Amino acid sequence: MNLKNFENKLHTLAVFHSFYQSPLWVKLSAYFQSETEEELLQSYTDLCAYIYSQGGDLSKIVERFVLDDENYYQLLLHKESGKEDLIERSMIRELEILQQLHDLKGEMLFKDLSYPYELPSWSNHVADLKQMYQQRLENLNREGYGIFARYHMFQVDENGLVPIQYPDPQSLASMTGYEIQRNALIQNTLAFLKGMKANNALLYGDAGTGKSSTIKAIVNAYKDEGLRLIEVRKSQIQWLPSLIESLAENPLKFIIFIDDLSFQTGDPDFILMKTILEGGSVASLSNTIIYATSNRRHLMKESFDDRAGSDIHHNDTIQECASLASRFGLTITFSKPAKDLYFEIVKGYAKEYDLQLSDSELMIKAEAFALRNNGRSPRTARQFVEHQKIVESME
């Protein structure tokens, strides 16, 4: 390999232009710019150290970059207008260049050095980048690209989306009770994934009944079908229009998740939320849907002044709140479980944690735990079982 020609080729990436912001390019570029043998040795070992920090296989680093890159070609491919032949030819040419980098061995860089001792090197493996990338393009609506290919749950800050590195591992299989509520949300989500008409959903009910866990478990179950979750706090509602617009051309499906949604009288976000649910502030998009949870059926925190006002004012407030809740289209109620359901949930968790208690002992202890704490709920059931597992481990 002629290293100078290879270096020049690496300077011609347009589709994969973000390569020039990658740590790998920073290390390679330093090597190519080295003039003395000492500089070459230093930059070469810096490159090796970086590759080692990523697992020691240069091929895998290049593959991760190519498969996760978010570029203009993908956006064109997703648009109804289709892709441009000129850009496609550039993409193919650049993949051939990156294939050379994928296969680059350490000896190719240090073979002309006069250094007489052994130098570090890295691993490579055989793979066809063009074939791998074509498979990714064919599955964009399920696998996504960029950070959406690496993560499936996100939060929002002033700089944009922040991946959740360690998302809640809650699974549908581990959930007991509330089958009717859970199935209603699953069916709505499946319709959404299939591009059918689906409703924004409000999960209303007592604290600890599994509203948020249900949403996260559904996303975990269908992430491989292209489902992603973006958690937005109530204080960030003003960012929703721009967030939804930014997702407009993304091939994946997004649940905008707002936990513990509620408003106070005169809250400016109340009107904005109502407008968003009506589709008035952003285009009607088929790839975003809003799922919210609340402990208040009509989403409004009622102050003492509200209750002390006139009946007309009080009724107007209730009607206004009800009008927002009705915009969700699908309202699912999660009530605190009765004793029998609570015990079924406890037994489900006890089996998962392999507790060594008879059913009668389990029921007595679980009921006592609920009385001492926050009453019967799926959350209380899990807390009891986790506590009991600790007790057993200490005996």
Predicted regions and their residues:
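Conserved AAA+ ATPase "SRH/arginine-finger" region at the nucleotide-binding site
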Residues: 310-322, 329-341
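Conserved P-loop NTPase mechanochemical-coupling segment
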Residues: 169-173, 212-235, 301-302, 394
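N-terminal pre-Walker A segment at the start of P-loop NTPase domains
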Residues: 164-190
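C-terminal alpha-helical "lid" subdomain
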Residues: 335-395
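Walker A/P-loop nucleotide-binding motif
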Residues: 178, 195-215
